[in-house]
Amino acid sequence: MKKFTCVQDIGDLKSALAEAFEIQKDRFKYVELGRNKTLMMIFFNSSLRTRLSTQKAALNLGMNVMVLDINQGAWKLETERGVIMDGDKPEHLLEAIPVMGCYCDIIGVRSFARFEDRDFDYQETILNQFIQYSGRPVFSMEAATRHPLQSFADLITIEEYKKTARPKVVMTWAPHPRPLPQAVPNSFAEWMNATDYDFVITHPEGYELAPQFVGNAKVEYDQMKAFEGADFIYAKNWAAYTGDNYGQILSKDREWTVSDRQMAVTNNAFFMHCLPVRRNMIVTDDVIESPQSIVIPEAANREISATVVLKRLIEGLE
Ligand SMILES: CCC[C@H](NC(C)=O)C(=O)O
Ligand SMILES: NC(=O)OP(=O)(O)O
């Protein structure tokens, strides 16, 4: 594997899952593979799970690890080409990227959507500059339009907990005080559409995701109807994608907050969320603390998804 930015990069899902469950049984099985190989993790945005689980995955494989928070300690970076750099940014990304590539073997990048220009975000400008100019294999630690390490962990978790071959999986929008990226819902939808699950997306009108991610999923504007008979509930907030509303909050309707009311019409569904989660905005205390909440095993599987991805990137090194 030469990059990991989307579901297509992992190839056949059944073999990726087999590898994940093998590593889950013995996460140090390939501890020699990464000897004298260096992972560089670059964060343009905050992180807890991605930062810790990806570092742990690298250690599982015997790698050296370097972590850089671009906005703390490094020079402020200009990212636009053609800009006269007479402002507060002393360095351009187009120099910084190949320099960082000199010091490592594999690069992970977190760079969220900026919500200033939809094309800039949806062309994955920052991530693609790392792919083009670093000279190293690059993987996404959540970029502008996807979060594949999260989605792979979500799939592993559903496969672990499902009680039927083709579970009904419902992704529901929920309210949040800030406009959050579409990367997690886009990516979850992309991975769910790559399975044979019964996948439904539910959100208020105006929160339609980009069609290339919705794919063949059923979209249901009535949340209670969507929840009927569900086996898994995946809750997430996202800002509007469509038209002039890009990056905007259209609703903070707390009727969409996942509570016992909605969970009561499911098939005793498991509750999932990528975390961090705003309690009593996205989900009530009772639901996220219930025996059906699997948000912690879901977060634990981030170590497994990252170990599989790093293993395949190391194996792909010349
Ligand atoms: C894994 C989630 C990261 C980010 N969450 C926040 C709070 O910014 C998001 O919603 O994309
Ligand atoms: N789910 C996830 O990626 O969490 P962090 O933003 O804390 O890394």
From Swiss-Prot:
Carbamoyl phosphate binds at residues 47-50, 75, 110, 147-150, 274-275, 302. Keywords: Amino-acid biosynthesis, Arginine biosynthesis, Transferase. Its EC number is 2.1.3.11. Pathway: Amino-acid biosynthesis; L-arginine biosynthesis. It catalyses: N(2)-succinyl-L-ornithine + carbamoyl phosphate = N(2)-succinyl-L-citrulline + phosphate + H(+). InterPro entries: ArgF'-like, Asp/Orn_carbamoyltranf_P-bd, Asp/Orn_carbamoylTrfase, Asp/Orn_carbamoylTrfase_sf, Asp_carbamoyltransf_Asp/Orn-bd. Disulfide bonds: none annotated. GO terms for biological process: arginine biosynthetic process via ornithine; citrulline biosynthetic process; L-arginine biosynthetic process. It comes from the Bacteria. One of its GO terms (molecular function) is amino acid binding. It is an enzyme of class 2 (transferase). SUPFAM superfamilies: Aspartate/ornithine carbamoyltransferase. The keyword Amino-acid biosynthesis applies. The record marks 90 as: Key residue in conferring substrate specificity for N-succinyl-L-ornithine versus N-acetyl-L-ornithine. Homotrimer. Catalyzes the transfer of the carbamoyl group from carbamoyl phosphate to the delta-amino group of N(2)-succinyl-L-ornithine to produce N(2)-succinyl-L-citrulline. Is essential for arginine biosynthesis. Has no activity with either L-ornithine or L-aspartate as substrate. Also has no detectable AOTCase activity, being unable to convert N(2)-acetyl-L-ornithine to N(2)-acetyl-L-citrulline. This is N-succinylornithine carbamoyltransferase.
